[in-house]
Amino acid sequence: MKKKSFGRFISVDPKICHGKLCFRGTRILVSDVLELVANGLSWDDIIKECHGSISRPAIAEVIRLAGLAIAEHADDYLERLASV
């Protein structure tokens, strides 16, 4: 796999963080930030937690892309939940 960009703020590079989605120019995992959002941290607190390496527009982009992924794969997720 080669380096790919998703939107303005997200990239994946097999040489960085084992090829997991990160915020461009950082080693901050998208999944970690989504977890912080899910745990109720404010966006300002998330930005502080990430030492200012990400921005509000970057967090918004991640949430939008997560929403698109859920919408695209909703049937798969429902099947997985039903089998648990």
Regions found by a protein language model. Give the residues of each.
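A short, structured beta-strand/loop element
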Residues: 5-45
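Hydrophobic packing positions characteristic
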Residues: 1-2
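Long, charge-rich, low-complexity alpha-helical segments
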Residues: 29-84
